[in-house]
Design a protein with these regions (language model features):
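Active-site mouth loops of central-metabolism enzymes
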Residues: 27-38, 87-94, 125-130
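Short, acidic/polar
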Residues: 35-47, 93-108, 161-164, 185-186
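A short, structured active-site edge motif that brings together acidic residues
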Residues: 78-91, 115-121, 181
């Protein structure tokens, strides 16, 4: 995605285009660490009512059923929402992926997903055979994509070595790589390679799990532009060409987090924010313990 200030200022209509031509709303609502239950359903419903049309969940979050309840409660036609979920680590491999995807559809109460991602490339259960497991998983995802049950397919937390291995057997290239991206944590080389391979970059934890908001420089930028520190971070993410996935259960902050289409940061400030020392370090997917 290449961001330009001339893009639509209406947060409800601002979309990016994936490599297959599918439109994806430029800001999503993240649901990591939101447990299954009425609280999560209420938060997702509030986000939809605030204007979000892109909801990001995962089987590993354990909240797909609550997300589905919120989608139905919203009363919006399914086609007006962009729903993403992700394959859980124990379910890699062709047959397991097919079964897991169908469970996700059932939990969400939908007959298709807009985007389905491999959540992690190297789960501990497949450490000695991750390449083969990912190849089988991807074959299953390609089949669902061709059947129209997934509108776009991609990956999350994949480094270049994982992408290269996947592309050796893939017939359809990933359209998205969802990564931990925030001020001071830009993963430049990985982002460059992902873009060269045609992938849009989604940013999870775009506020650095909150630590970025406490950096003194962010307060200065917030004052300069008359915005909250979170809005500065999210606008920065857009101008970096990332698609941010902020999370908040607070209705006021939910609304603020999508009010980022009516101002721009200077090129100098974008570069300076990217270079901030915010203490962020990407997790190595080859050493995860799950």
């Amino acid at each position: 995605m290449e961001w330009t200030p001339a893009m639509e200022h209406n947060s409800l209509s601002a979309c990016c285009t994936l490599s297959n031509g599918a439109a994806i709303p430029c800001v999503g609502y993240g649901t990591w660490q939101m447990p299954d239950g009425s609280g999560t359903a209420d938060a997702v419903l509030a986000a939809i009512r605030a204007g979000y049309r892109h909801i990001d969940t995962a089987a590993a979050y354990g909240n797909e059923r609550s997300v589905g309840n919120a989608i139905r409660a919203s009363g919006l036609p399914r086609e007006e929402l962009f729903i993403t979920s992700k394959l859980a680590n124990p379910d890699h491999g062709y047959e397991a992926t097919r079964a897991a995807f169908l469970r996700t559809l059932d939990s969400l109460g939908t007959d298709y997903l807009d985007l389905y991602l491999i959540h992690w490339p190297n789960p501990i259960a497949f450490r000695d055979q991750w390449k083969q497991a990912n190849a089988g998983t991807w074959r299953a995802m390609e089949e669902f994509y061709r059947e129209g049950r997934i509108r776009a397919i991609g990956v999350s937390n994949f480094c270049q070595r994982h992408l290269e291995a996947l592309l050796e057997s893939a017939q359809i290239a990933p359209m998205v790589n969802q990564l931990s991206l925030s001020p001071g944590l830009t993963q430049d080389e990985l982002c460059r390679y992902s873009r060269e391979m045609g992938m849009l970059l989604e940013a999870y934890s775009p506020l650095g799990t909150g630590r970025v908001l406490n950096v003194p420089e962010m307060a200065a930028y917030a004052e300069k532009y008359g915005r909250s520190a979170a809005q500065i971070c999210l606008r920065w993410s857009l101008q970096m060409g990332f698609l941010p996935l902020p999370k908040s259960a607070d209705p006021t902050r939910m609304a603020q987090n999508i009010q980022i289409f009516d101002f721009s940061l200077s090129d100098e400030d974008v570069a300076a924010i990217a270079a901030l020392d915010c203490g962020g370090v990407p997790r190595d997917p080859d050493t995860t313990t799950f």
